[in-house]
Structures are given as structure tokens and as C-alpha cells.
Amino acid sequence: LNELLQRIKRPGHRHYDAYLVLDADNILDPNFISEIEKVYSAGYEIVTCYRNSKNYGDNWISAGYALWFLREAQYLNNARMRLGSSCAVSGTGFLFSDEVLRECGGWNFFLLTEDIEFTIDNVVRGHKVGYAAGAVLYDEQPTSFAQSWRQRMRWSKGYLQVFRKYASRLFSGIAHGSFSCYDMTMNIMPAAVLTGTSIVVNVGAAIANATNGGSMAALGLSVLQTVLSLYMTLFVLGVITTVTEWRSIRCTGGKKVLYAFTFPVFMLTYVPIC
């Protein structure tokens, strides 16, 4: 992307007010450009879209990705937009102005999750990312677990890289009252830290239980309750998103219902990845 933008901005080439980033296999709703432009014209220098998927019904893996991105669009970015906070760029289907590009000194985002890096870099600069709910993009999701594992492993490493690079500036923004900085910090907080904390707490509880003469059956029941609680929490999130975005999901009704049940399993596979 950096090389392309440098070529576009060579002397003698046309000047562009903004740039739209898309993957070659993305399919756009007929009104995509006009909907993105509405938000851009409202004053947002960076705009992201409603990220849908064209292969939701392939299997539980593609559906897991797709449902997460629908939830991200409707219940994270849409909520942020309503609250006046900054939204977050996710993968593809986003616009940024030439002014933003100049402020950044070009596209200098080379971490494993450059979309998140770009978002955080602009949030700490004081920019807000807008969300165009009517700009619908259809993306293709992985269908094999091996491919999904490698991709999400890369994302997890990328989150760590971004957190390491921007943590101090995010915390400084939080100290100065920036809700967007707080929100983005929670968005990129390394899952490994949260998972590690959970493991330490549970191991500590197991040791305490054994020391005090507690039964292993009680410990096993406690672990089972924790897993079921996590499953039900994720299941509810998946069901709510499935119901509200029902008409946007491109697959049969039976698969929509089935994949609401497999969504928690997909999300729980993040634990060993992180």
C-alpha cells in the first residue's frame, strides 16, 4: 500500500482528496461509495464500513468470522458513532483523506495488524474514525481451521506489537480524558494478558482448594461452570447479532441458527491462540 500511494503521489499525477482501500475480491453494495462519501462529507477524515461476508454459510469457521465482523459493525462501531467516539478500521473497506496521509508522513504502518495500527495512530493524534452503516461490503472468510489458526495467530501477534508501540500514548490520552483512547486500549489489550491472569487465578484457586482439603470433584465442577458461563455469554452475543442482522446474513435460516451455536466454540479457540 505504501508503494502504491507513493506512485500515485508522484509529480505529474492527479491530486486526490481521499483514498479508498479494498481487497481485490471484495463485493460492494451499489450504494457503497455514496454512503462512504456522506460520512466523509460530514467531516470525518477516516471512514469505515459495514463489513458483511459473502461465504457465511460455507461452514462454522467462515460463519464465526462473519458473525464477529457483523457484531463489530453493528454493536461496536455503530455504538461508537452514536456516542461520538472513534470507530475502528477493520481489514478492508475504509477511506482516509489525503490530509490524514500527509499528517502520518505517508503510509508508515508495517506491523502485522496495520489496520489497527493505523486506527490507533490517528486516535492518539486526535482524529475520529467515522462509520458508514449504509456502506455494505462483502468479504470472503477462511474456511479451514489451519488457515484460520495461522491468520488469527498473526492477528494476536499484531495486537501485541501495536500495544507495545502505542501503550504509553494511549495511557497518556486516557489520563487527559480521551474516551476513544480508553476504548482503543480495551480493544487491543493483549488477550494473552487476560488469559494468563485467568489461568493464574484458576491455578491459585486449585492450589488453595487442594491445601484446604477440598475435593477434586468440586474443583472440576467449578471449571465446568466457568466454561459453560463463557459459552453462554458468547452464545447470547451471537444470537443477538444473528437476530438483529438476520436479513443481512446470506445463507439459509437453518444455517443461521446452527452457526449461532457454533459461534462460541469458534471464539473459544482464541484461548490457545492467544
Where are these regions (language model features)?
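The conserved acidic donor/metal-binding loop of glycosyltransferases
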Residues: 23-27, 110, 122
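Active-site donor/metal-binding and catalytic loop motifs
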Residues: 133-147
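Catalytic donor-sugar/metal-binding loop of nucleotide-sugar-dependent glycosyltransferases
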Residues: 84, 119-137
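Long helical/loop segments within the catalytic core of UDP-sugar-dependent glycosyltransferases
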Residues: 2-16, 30-112, 149, 153-164
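Short aromatic/hydrophobic "clamp" motif used to bind/position activated sugar donors
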Residues: 19
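Membrane-embedded multi-pass helical conduit in multi-pass membrane proteins
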Residues: 187-274
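Acidic donor-binding loop at a coil-to-helix junction in glycosyltransferase catalytic cores
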Residues: 112-118
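Active-site-adjacent helix/loop segment of glycosyltransferases
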Residues: 149-187
